[in-house]
């Protein structure tokens, strides 16, 4: 089994983002990606990852209003994992690597092939796209970040378009909007890093919460879902070799 720890926060208390690569234990095993709902922990990361690698995982494919899903049950006797959710549902569209091999409505044990733990800031210092969308009234435009990454092993580059937030803009401000937003975002973002969670997510550390980053606490981490964007690459390969090199911004009017 492979284990990986990504420390994006060094505090004694942190938010744990845990993702597993597992293989079903049956005659025709499917490869699955399992991510655990984020939880708070004060356990040293090196100790937590050891306990995370020793759990038992059961999965069952089900149907929900959101589409095909997986019901996940985690069994552990470790007090260290007391804060970790043990029963939850995740999207099968992101989780399943080999859909045809996964039976419906059958509970199956899994073998853990890899486990990744990312230490993020405490929940009060995390912001998502959904959080910002709820705080924007009468939006007129949306801000898209075009995040460029480079594979340091091959020098290949990929640009991932990520929806950041809706904004409300007056007509008189439209001409200068893009320059203003680009300046604000460049001042606000100190880094961006891909981590394995719900497929993949982008973590942006924000230093300035003016203008486009209003409602985000300074020094907080902004989390953007990428899903299975780079699914053909292994999670470890992506997180080790894909480095953030640049970010451009696009301001688009909302479409009806």
UniProtKB/Swiss-Prot annotation:
Keyword Metal-binding (UniProt): no
Subunit record text: Forms dimers. Forms higher-order oligomers. Interacts with glycoprotein G (via N-terminus). Interacts with protein M2-1; this interaction directs the matrix protein localization to cytoplasmic inclusions comprising viral proteins L, N, P, and M2-1 and mediates the matrix protein association with the nucleocapsid. Interacts with host KPNB1; this interaction mediates nuclear import of the matrix protein early during infection. Interacts with host AP3M1; this interaction plays an essential role in trafficking the matrix protein in host cells.
Annotated region (Interaction with M2-1), positions in chain: 1-110
Protein name: Matrix protein
GO biological process terms held by the UniProt record: virion assembly
Entry GO CC: host cell cytoplasm; host cell nucleus; host cell plasma membrane; membrane; viral envelope
Post-translational modification: Phosphorylation is important for oligomerization.
């Amino acid at each position: 089994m492979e284990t990986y720890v990504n420390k994006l926060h060094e505090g004694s208390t942190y938010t744990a983002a845990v993702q597993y690569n597992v293989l079903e234990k049956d005659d025709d095993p499917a490869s699955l990606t399992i991510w655990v709902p984020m939880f708070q922990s004060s356990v040293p990361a090196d100790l937590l990852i050891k306990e995370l690698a020793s759990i038992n995982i059961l999965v069952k494919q089900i149907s929900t209003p959101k589409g095909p899903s997986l019901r996940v049950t985690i069994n552990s006797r470790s007090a260290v994992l007391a804060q970790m959710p043990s029963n939850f549902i995740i999207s099968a569209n992101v989780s399943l690597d080999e859909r045809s091999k996964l039976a419906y409505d059958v509970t199956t044990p899994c073998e853990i092939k890899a486990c990744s733990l990312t230490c993020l800031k405490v929940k009060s210092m995390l912001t998502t796209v959904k959080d910002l969308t709820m705080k924007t009234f009468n939006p007129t435009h949306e801000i898209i970040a075009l995040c460029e990454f480079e594979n340091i092993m091959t020098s290949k580059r990929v640009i991932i378009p990520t929806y950041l937030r809706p904004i409300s803009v007056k007509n008189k401000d439209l001409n200068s909007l893009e320059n203003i937003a680009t300046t604000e975002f460049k001042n606000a973002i100190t880094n961006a890093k891909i981590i394995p969670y719900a497929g993949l997510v982008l973590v942006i550390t924000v230093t300035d919460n003016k203008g486009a980053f209003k409602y985000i606490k300074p020094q907080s981490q902004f989390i953007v879902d990428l899903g299975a964007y780079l699914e053909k690459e292994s999670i470890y390969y992506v997180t080790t070799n894909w480095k953030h090199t640049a970010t451009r911004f696009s301001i688009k009017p909302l479409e009806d």
